[in-house]
């Protein structure tokens, strides 16, 4: 259901209805929240209810997105065609950078957990959990901007489309940087209250570690916003190799060695530093 929903979102967005694509995602996500509450508390279904809500949400989103095809607005048509390995590999190559980004995030979280557990124990791991959850939201902002420009950039190929591509890239980078600045300002000023939202037991050590970590860790937003937009822009302009290299540098080649090295040199502070250092280096290549 998740895969089908994400696939449908991309088809609808690239077929000229980004507003419907956005509506499907927003309503599906809000439905997940509302159904979580309904199934867990009033209906008393517990974890089964949470799982049921999570499975139902993409169905709601897909129902909304399917109206694009039911109204006859779609430009996509099913056709008989012979399987082509070269065509399939060309299509897949454009998605490799996104694949690397998604896979690497889980591996990096695992590595960070082991390093932090050794340095600060369970409290440190819990604090990193706070950062990781907030990072999902903040990174989604840049990802949304990058995915939003993809259909426009892809529809203006060649030399004739270069001025439009350049303009869209500038707008996207400027927007991403401004939102990164706003996000970091909120994090910097409200780090303690934000950490307390995840701290039911009022553990002062957890709040201290998480708030200090946020102020260092999320300086990476200024660089990651550029890197994310750059990777999607490269894929959209049929340059998958460059996009792959950027994603590989961000996902594996730099972040993990940097985490081990900086953790050895600066302890827990070094781990928080490893992400902005990595994103900053990759930004040079972007």
Question: Where do the model's predicted regions map?
Answer:
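Hydrophobic transmembrane alpha-helices of multi-pass small-molecule transporters
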Residues: 32-36, 62-66, 136-140, 184, ...
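Hydrophobic alpha-helical transmembrane segments in multi-pass membrane proteins
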Residues: 2-3, 29, 62, 98-110, ...
